[in-house]
Design a protein with these regions (language model features):
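Core catalytic lobe of class I
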Residues: 3-288
Length: 289
């Protein structure tokens, strides 16, 4: 394995990423642009059939280092993603949305024999957004954030109606933050801070501290802010990214031949990094070679 420090904060490794993950800091972003199973380059699988087995050891390693702030951007074909999706779910990755890279008609103009293929010309790839679901230890088991909030409040001995008093609302806390139904969503950090303060002031003395993950001190507002992924929504951008395939100096070539047919435009790479991280965050690109 060779490591080259390109510039401050940017490190290039020449080696098998499976042997390198343990050396890397925890990621805020993972940009995974690995095999598609289309026999597109040396080492690629010939078909998508074996993609789940190929990706699983990588997904297992990503999951060891990922935090609730981590966003995974998984590039592939539609069928390749469909095959790998169950493995991502198995390791606790939550699907957010499927983004489509539309390369436009120029990508296939004059180069598609639809009579032989019997399907429409393909001008797309997908970049699927996943986040690592937050989980909490509860009596030796892992529980979701939704369940953990209810379990912790139940320990206080107070009725759930008191969560509204804690948040200074009429019924929003019981209706949104402590509901069992699909309408639940994560309380904002300022509301969580109020809930924690109220629980530890009025809850049963023998159960304190409440809403603690170390058993010694309650979680703070800052702690809670680290329990969700970063997302900076750019104005006017949807989940369909219409950008032509590279044909300019940005395309990496060996002689006259492209080194990689599916090289991504820097515009799209920059977009996903900027959407899901801040300055000085850690970005993994495990298949950058």
């Amino acid at each position: 394995m060779n490591k080259i420090d390109i510039i401050s904060g940017l490190h290039l490794y020449n080696g098998d990423s499976l042997e390198l993950y343990q050396l890397w800091d925890k990621p805020t972003v993972i940009m995974a642009d690995g095999p598609y199973g289309v026999n597109g380059f040396r080492g690629d699988l010939k078909t998508p059939v074996g993609l789940a087995e190929w990706y699983e050891p990588h997904i297992a390693e990503w999951s060891k280092k990922a935090t609730p702030q981590t966003t995974l951007w998984f590039w592939n074909t539609e069928i390749g993603w469909a095959i790998v999706h169950p493995i991502l779910e198995k390791y606790g990755w939550e699907y957010k949305t499927c983004n489509v890279w539309d390369k436009g008609m120029s990508h296939v103009a004059g180069n598609t024999n639809t009579k032989t293929l019997s399907h429409l010309p393909v001008v797309s790839e997908v970049c699927v957004q996943y986040v690592k679901k937050a989980s909490f230890d509860w009596n030796g088991e892992k529980v979701s954030m939704k369940d953990w909030l209810r379990l912790e409040w139940e320990r206080t001995g107070m009725p759930f109606s008191k969560t509204n008093e804690a948040c200074h609302v009429v019924n929003a806390a019981t209706r949104k933050y402590f509901t069992k139904c699909h309408l639940w969503y994560m309380p904002p950090a300022d509301m969580f801070e109020k809930i924690v303060a109220y629980a530890n002031e009025h809850g049963k003395e023998e159960g304190k501290p409440y809403f603690s993950i170390n058993g010694k001190t309650p979680m703070t507002k800052e702690d809670w802010e680290h329990m969700k992924p970063k997302f900076n929504c750019p104005f006017g951008v949807t989940n369909v990214w219409t950008t032509a395939q590279l044909r300019n100096s940005e395309r990496i070539k060996k002689g006259l031949k492209a080194v990689h047919l599916n090289q991504k435009p820097l515009e799209l790479i920059g977009r996903i990094i900027e959407m899901s991280s801040d300055k000085n965050d850690v970005v993994w690109d495990p298949f950058g070679g």
